[in-house]
């Protein structure tokens, strides 16, 4: 199949990468796993065995008229431990390479179908100026876009950093979440070739 390239000849690409059927279940599973892997999972509360104090019995067992108590660390007490204390845990989920590649191909194919993937011959800015990038995006009639280049372009990265709905990445930096997070995805022809090789 062929992809239209702005300002250049059409680019021949693989049908399996850019023309496959959308697998919603697979994409959902991979995106959820990706989001789960981004969780820190560092929360920690103290159980009754971890709270400080509570060595001595607060008052004697009988004769005070108060309810019996053996420790000030009891979860019933204001300064006691937490009954079912939340502990740090690993939320990451396993995603096989085949599944990951399948989800990426599915997303790219859907972007092509919905005409949300824009392929350009070249995309760069002369200086790390946001104004320059805004002008370039205006030419393409874009306000919400992910820009993917074949290699890290520092000027482009710095220019995009201050824009709310614009991000610039190289091919190695894209993932399922970033591809679906933006309204449009702008890729250079060289980046398209690299993506195809990466997912082959």
UniProtKB/Swiss-Prot annotation:
The keyword rRNA-binding applies. Signal peptide: none annotated. The keyword Ribonucleoprotein applies. Residues 42-65 are annotated as: Disordered. It holds the Pfam family Ribosomal_L4. One of its GO terms (cellular component) is ribosome. This is Large ribosomal subunit protein uL4. It comes from Vibrio campbellii (strain ATCC BAA-1116).
């Amino acid at each position: 199949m062929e992809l239209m390239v702005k300002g250049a000849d059409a680019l021949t690409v693989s049908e399996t990468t850019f023309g496959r059927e959308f697998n919603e279940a697979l994409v959902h599973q991979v995106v959820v796993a990706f989001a789960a892997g981004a969780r820190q999972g560092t929360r920690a509360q103290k159980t009754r065995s971890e709270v400080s104090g509570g060595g001595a019995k607060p008052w004697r067992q009988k004769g005070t008229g108060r309810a019996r108590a053996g420790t000030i660390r009891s979860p019933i007490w204001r300064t006691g431990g937490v009954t079912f204390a939340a502990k740090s845990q690993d939320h990451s989920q396993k995603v096989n390479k085949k599944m990951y590649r399948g989800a990426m191909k599915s997303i790219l194919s859907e972007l092509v179908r919905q005409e949300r993937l824009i392929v350009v011959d070249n995309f760069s800015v002369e200086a790390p100026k946001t104004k320059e990038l805004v002008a370039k995006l205006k030419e393409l009639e874009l306000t919400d876009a992910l820009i993917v280049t074949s290699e890290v372009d520092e000027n482009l990265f710095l220019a995009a950093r201050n824009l709310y709905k614009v991000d610039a990445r190289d091919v190695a930096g894209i993932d399922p979440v970033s591809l679906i997070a933006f309204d449009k995805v702008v890729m250079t022809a060289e980046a398209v070739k690299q993506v195809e090789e990466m997912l082959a």
